[in-house]
Amino acid sequence: MGAQLRVYRRRIRSTKSMAKITRAMELIAATRITKAQRAAEAAAPYAREITRAVSAVAARVSDHPLLTEAENPTRAAVLVITSDKGLAGAYTANAIKEAERLTALLNEQGKEVLTYMVGRKGIGFYKFRERPLADSWEGFTERPSYMHAMEISSALMEKFIQETAEGGVDEIHIVSTEFISMINQRARASRILPLEVEEVDSKVLEAEQGPLPLYEFEPGAEEVLDQLLPKYVTNRIYFALLESAASQHASRRAAMKAATDNAEELVKTLTRQANQARQAEITNEISEIVGGADALAAASAGSE
């Protein structure tokens, strides 16, 4: 019984130690969420304005190669953003699941898929299953910079401009995680090229976004679009990296909070079991003492 009590006490100590670690990781993740949110909020105005500018130019240019749908698209690039580290709940699993759903859909449409991966966890997942990756990046998912987005954008744009027969792609999709709230993040897939220009009533658009800007294009709309579209693609990737970083920290915070709560509950259970074992040990010792006293009393009475 004494050995069992020691086991309980040892488990209580180790569980309390683990709870301290997960609590510290929860607090660190909470701090990083705030920083990641601020970075995303700071990038939002530029993302919004460049999107409006590209939309305005695209409305005047109909035959630009980055806007034109291929008659028979045969190959698509899919950029998947995962994490470099674990202990983030289902963050990476959800992103990979969404990427696999998109890949299956594109395959059904007769398109070959080239997968581009961001994050060690996603890279490890694909390498373990011997799945091919066209390219990969790692080491910056928690704190992405604009330079990282430019590097990724450059690789994808090079493939998009290249002829399909020479190994190029007809479409570029991105799978990232949308930060909705501290407790709600959602993996999503979106196409960034060819750019989809939707016909929207100007009155409806003005009611939603305010007065539309009036642009004059020099030397011409097509030349301006040549400069704007690469920046637009880079910005879309950068914003996706920032949102995914915030989502990753939020998911890690939730996972660490759940781990801390579970550890505290386990400590309560183990403490209760240890107390029961201690009480049983005390009861057993008392029974042995009483039994010994009775035996001595009986022996003394017999000798008399």
UniProtKB/Swiss-Prot annotation:
InterPro entries linked to this entry: ATP_synth_F1_ATPase_gsu (IPR035968), ATP_synth_F1_gsu (IPR000131), ATP_synth_F1_gsu_CS (IPR023632)
GO biological process: proton motive force-driven plasma membrane ATP synthesis
Leader sequence residues: none
Domain of life: Bacteria
One Pfam entry name: ATP-synt
Keyword set includes Membrane: yes
Keywords associated with the record: ATP synthesis, Cell membrane, CF(1), Hydrogen ion transport, Ion transport, Membrane, Transport
Cellular location(s): Cell membrane
GO MF entries: ATP binding; proton-transporting ATP synthase activity, rotational mechanism
GO cellular component: plasma membrane; proton-transporting ATP synthase complex
Membrane topology type: Peripheral membrane protein
Chief localisation class: membrane
Stored PANTHER family: ATP SYNTHASE GAMMA CHAIN (PTHR11693), ATP SYNTHASE SUBUNIT GAMMA, MITOCHONDRIAL (PTHR11693:SF22)
Function: Produces ATP from ADP in the presence of a proton gradient across the membrane. The gamma chain is believed to be important in regulating ATPase activity and the flow of protons through the CF(0) complex.
Subunit composition and interactions: F-type ATPases have 2 components, CF(1) - the catalytic core - and CF(0) - the membrane proton channel. CF(1) has five subunits: alpha(3), beta(3), gamma(1), delta(1), epsilon(1). CF(0) has three main subunits: a, b and c.
Protein name, as recorded: ATP synthase gamma chain
